[in-house]
Amino acid sequence: MASSQVGDMVNGNAEPTRHLAKFPPSLWGDRFTSFTLDKQLSDKYGNEIEVLKEQVRSMVVAGGRKAVEQINLINVLERLGVSYHFEKEIEEQLEQLFAKFEDNEDYDLFTIALHFRIFRQHGYKMSCDVFNKFRDSNGEFKETVSNDVQGMLSLYEATYLKIRGEGFLDEAHAFTIAQLESLVGGPHLSSDLSEQVMHALKQSIHRGFPRLEAKHFISFYEKDASRNETLLRLAKLDFNQLQLSHREELCHIFRWWKELDLISKVPYARDRAVECFFWSTCAYYEPQHSVGRAVLTKIMLLLSVTDDTYDAYGTYDEVKLYTNAVQRWDVSAMDELPDYMKALYRALLNVYDEVERDLAKQGRAYGVHHSKEAFKEIVRSYEIEAEWFKEGYVVSFEEYMKNALVTSTGRLHTTSCFMGLEADVATTEAFEWILTKPKMVATSGAIGRLVDDVMSHDEEQERGHVATGLDCYMKQHGVSKQEAIVELYKMIENAWRDINEEMLKPTAISMKLLIRVLNLSRISDVVYKYVDGYTHPEIIKDHVISLFEDPIPM
């Protein structure tokens, strides 16, 4: 947190010393300022999509198909990114398939692992004992497994659905990674299969950004000799049509952000309108959630600037004033703020008023109160961190995490995300569930907080920053930075296990809500996997271009 070394002067003439972050500027210039939707092309795509959807729907519900064929069809639909059109039909099929599933000795590793992954993704708790037949009397994997590349790849993907206490899946994860890495680029893999393996090792299905992973899979599927041309055509059309819609939405958001002109008044902050929309599109990409994407993006942008204000510019006295103003949530509180904070505070109040008006038209404004309260909670926790930095405190890891579970934004992002869902899904009970501090939301926030602490540690400490979870763990346990990183990654993996378990039936709330929390967790894996891709947007630039600019060749 930024502190004053000269003196915490809010309205005096002397400018206090500030620990400026010097964040990289926006990458995009005016690139997304204008976009004209090709209505004729969009309508053409839409008409053909409707015809193909009915053909595929008939395939999904058709009787007489073997269970293996049905699970393979569902897998292809999901990986192509078109399963959202057939949610009801797929759930009905999976319920029947799970009830009738038998561990048939004829099923190979690929098929067993595929069943395991698909069932668990949909909340069905298939036991990992189904993999026992692939181990010898010593508990080691049989030699035949090492020769089955597709089987190992399927098992590798399945291991990401593990929960606590499933040591076998930990062993399988390490085993398949080692085996697959040894095969990449070797003579035993075709170039296409080698490319699939390399991508899987870089980004798993379960933790990936659904729309990006769909685009990758489409490129693999069209080279598959056994491909279904109807499915492939639907996937390409669907991706391109949604891309047109997302691009138009991004243009509206980008222009709104430019017209708000907040960054010119707070130039110390990260300018990340495009990246926030990218984030929101991961939370929900489906066409019916356009309002939700806009709402979530705007709130994320305001939170990002607020975070940078506490983290990389504001003095302790200044941020205390801002915290108090946010708690009051009243325009009269602006009078007590320094000029640069007035612009941010005005934007905060105006955006929430705008969001409330838009959602009121659809009878969904009840969630706005919950989002405001979550925002208030976060700035209180930001102030706690500012005090720690001012006093030079390195608190215990447990105390750090208690506060970090708030600053990780899990509650705010989940609440704001729910505001964009249909009223019959995001009910008042759904928002009340968030208030109970459920494990699903807490662990989602913990993943984001811990991986960010690891990836941004060196840069933040160089400029002056409150002690992160990494620092607190190192001091408390007397370990090296590398040893602390290992332990934090163990915590991250356990958090993923908890998320997986929370999504097994019976669930606390609708799976339609839980999948949004899962998607918010996935963002951390994609954006912070190797470096802080939000602070350094060039890291995810190719993802943004792939998602919003580059169509799939038809």
Curated annotation (Swiss-Prot):
- What family, per the record? Belongs to the terpene synthase family.
Q: Where does Mg(2+) 2 bind?
A: 307, 311
The record lists Mg(2+) 1 as bound by 307, 311
Q: Which Pfam families has this protein been placed in?
A: Terpene_synth, Terpene_synth_C
Enzyme class, one word? lyase
Which InterPro entries has this protein been placed in?
Isoprenoid_synthase_dom_sf, Terpene_cyclase-like_1_C, Terpene_cyclase_plant_C1, Terpene_synth_N, Terpene_synth_N_sf, Terpene_synthase-like, Terpene_synthase_metal-bd, Terpenoid_cyclase/PrenylTrfase
Identification of the protein by name: Valerianol synthase TPS1G
Q: Name one GO molecular function term.
A: terpene synthase activity
Taxonomic lineage per UniProt?
Eukaryota, Viridiplantae, Streptophyta, Embryophyta, Tracheophyta
Name the keywords, alphabetized: Lyase, Magnesium, Metal-binding
What does this protein do, in the record's words?
Terpene synthase that catalyzes the biosynthesis of the terpene valerianol, which is a volatile compound of floral scent.
Give the catalytic activity: (2E,6E)-farnesyl diphosphate + H2O = valerianol + diphosphate
Q: Under which EC number(s) is this enzyme classified?
A: 4.2.3.204
Signal peptide segment: none
Which cofactors go with this protein? Mg(2+)
